[in-house]
C-alpha cells in the first residue's frame, strides 16, 4: 500500500496544481510563470543528482575506476530517448506559437497537453526505478529515499499542473476542460512508474542504467523546456531565484529523508 501511495503522490501534485484553474484569474502573469518554471527546474535538477545519478554511481562501485560507466551510458540513452520522442510526437510548448515534431492537424490545446505529457514520462520512470530498487533490496535505495523523490516530484508537479491548466483556460477552454487537460497530462506518471517497476524486476542488474536514464531524460526536459520558459521576455532574475529555491528544497528533502 505504501508503494502504491508513493507512486500516486506525484500525480496528486499535478492534479492539485491543475485545480488552481478554479481559484485563480484567467491567466498567469509572466513573473509567476517564470517563478513556477524556475522552481520546477530546480527540483528536477536536484532530484536528478541526489536521487538518481549519485545512487547509480554508488551502485557501480564494484567497477572501480569505471564506476561512472553505467551512469554515463544511461544518462545519454535518456537524453536521446526524449530527443527521439520530441521528433516523433507533435506538441506545442506553453507560451510558444510554433509546434514541434511532425506536422499535425491537432488543435493547440491537444498539442499543449501532449507537450507536458511527453515530458512527464521521465517523472513516472524515476519513481518506478526507485521503488523497484527498494523492492529488490538495494542498500542504496531505502523506502525513505524513494518517498523523498515522490514528494519532490509532487512539489515540482504542483506548479507544472498550474502551468498547463491556466494557459488552457486562457486559450478559451472551460475551467473544467482546462483542469482535465492538466490532470490528463499527469496520468502518464503512475502508468510509467508501474511499467518501469515491472520491467525492472526482470533487469535488476541494470538498475544503475535505469536510474541514470531517468536522470538524463529529466535533465533534457529542464534544458529543452523549463529554462527557456523561465527566460522568456525581458530579462529578470526571478526564474533563477526560484530555481535556487527549488534546488535547495529538493536537496534538503532528499538528504533529510534519504
Task: Set out the residue ranges of the language-model regions.
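Intrinsically disordered, metal-sensing/regulatory segments
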Residues: 1-258
